[in-house]
Amino acid sequence: GWSSRSQSPTVASDSKNTTSTAAEASVGDYISISGLGMITLEGVGLVMGLDGTGGDPRPSPFRMSLLKDMQRRGVPDPKALLRSPKTALVIVRAYLPPLIRKGDPFDVEVRLPPGSEATSLNGGWLMETDLAERAVVPGEGVLAGHIFARAKGHVLISHGEGDSEDLAGVLRRGRVPGGGLSRKDRDLVVALKNRYRSVRMARRIADRIGKRFYAYNRHGVREPLANPKTDRTIVLKIHPKYRDNFPRFLRVIRQIKVREDDVTRQVRMQQLSGQLESVQTARKAALSLEAIGTKAIPFLKTALEHSELEVRFHAATALAYLDDNSGAATLAEAARHQRAFRVYALAALSTLEDAPSQLLLRELLKPLEVCNTEGCQHHGNPIEVSCPHCREAGLVKQSAELQYGAFRALWTRDRLDPVIRGERIGDLFTLHEIEAGGRPLIHLTQLQRPEIVLFGNDQELRTPLAVQAGNHIWINAQPGAPTVTISRYQVGRPPRREVVSTRIADVIRGSVKLGASYPDIVQMLVQAQRQQNVPGQIAIDAVPRTGRLYFREANSTTSPADAPPNLFPTSVQDAKSDASSEDEPDQAGAGQDDDAVSATGAGGASLVDRRLAKPDPADTSSTDPQASSQDSSGSRFSFLEKLFR
């Protein structure tokens, strides 16, 4: 039979108009993309090693499921183990992120089921637990699907302040950072819209994507990243350059032209170069040039001389993903001075492998010293060493978010970089000591991986000192003492002691030597900070965030929000203010008549003209296709949920 389905995005009676429209059509006009949502996984697990705070679980489907699993694993006398006050049955939940690969870690949350006799998960260890999709089927109860992942590890709970009644709920739940391991690869699936569905069109779209994005296998053979599977579906693999910013990868793919010869492409690049000069159209023009590939690099470079930071930023970002470092200095400038662009600038810098870009990221690890001398021509700007007024008074502008963001970008780029290379502590977590200057900072993580970063490699605990690391380890020091005594007391075992210096890194190592876990170390550091034994501040998951205000002088129409890079995980449920980890003021600065970047439902930032009394209906037609298909859930990709999340 024959099909009358149209093979171009527009049906028109005039064949010339139809041909023209088809030539202008982009891949995004033909496709929708699935596989962006989270897969919710659940399981029933057993937490061991509790200090008498566990309990025998009540009869329930959860208990039956756990007993079957323990019997399958050959655990001797599982019922006696469940009755022990050192164990507790827990519900394990995780969210499998898009594009995860087999063996990749992800966060897991655990909680006690309603009615559990257990009172606290503090100090516990989650035994290996299978995680699968689960669904309630009428008449059959809860059924489990394929096993997608397994989870295990130390349980980290929130160490909030309050009495035992206030903390009761907090102690009944926790998370295992990086405790899940995926057993499957997740790829994206590109689906042709029904009206364009055909084998020929699927091959054409896959061919256009594959010519722009490809990789080399271990034999050095070039392979396209898009492969047609049926007359409607194309399997899409992420390009390594976009591994930590796949939302941008999808936006670029949508800008690829389906039919375009060399002459037409050259004309279009000239047009896009002009659009790149305007703040209203710079973002989309940069994406379109990036979609063309390396031939567009000269046009993007010309925009680096533009007077507007916004234009320079969009051009520099596109250049970075084209593996050109010409805009690296602009990205570093945006990361330090413009919080609305910071997350995107750091993600782009992390993709550049050249030495100058590495040095720029290293500089971002350090606070910025600005002139605070009234009347000096450099007042409010970085100190000029040759200026006598600058030397009179300096003000250190320090951002925990920027320092840790630069660290994460460097770690993603090269985790063996000698400036940030860490030390593996007892196969429990990684300890990094960084010479950064400024006020001392300790950064702790509750997401992705257990990690402690000391900004200031000679940080020492103040004495007198008396804190705990877990239930059995005490850390004490007398006033003015140069050493700290770490003691472990446990019923039925002889006491153990370690004497170390007051350096925080040495205290951490000594505590782990006596059996402290990562949650125990976090507890110790938080307690020491509350008692003012820590010389600086402690920040937890201080990653760059989206949804911030950016002011500019020119009018603009509404521009769709960018979905955030997945380089920096955050939480959908995190209601904390950015100010908690951001010491420097918003450098956006302009008058009330300027345009602002406002938060959107997708968690991104949109450029909005604050002077408009009401939105222009015409603006809706200019919204990019990606705005409606970044995430069907309407939230930031949920791996950005903090599994207190």
Q: Where in this protein do the model-derived segments appear?
A:
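Low-complexity, intrinsically disordered segments with a bias for serine/threonine
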Residues: 7-10, 390, 626
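The −1 position to Zn-ligating cysteines in a subset of zinc-ribbon hairpins
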Residues: 370, 386
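Structural detector for internal amphipathic alpha-helices that build alpha-solenoid repeat scaffolds
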Residues: 282-292, 302-305, 312-324, 330-333, ...
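Bacterial Sec signal peptide processing site at the extreme N-terminus
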Residues: 1-16, 20
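Beta-strand/loop-dominated core regions that host nucleotide or nucleotide-derived cofactor-binding catalytic loops
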Residues: 14-37, 42, 48-270, 276-281, ...
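Generic short amphipathic/hydrophobic targeting helices enriched at N-termini
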Residues: 7, 379-381, 392, 593, ...
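Amphipathic alpha-helical scaffolding segments comprising HEAT/armadillo-like alpha-solenoid repeats
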Residues: 262-274, 294-305, 324-336, 354-366, ...
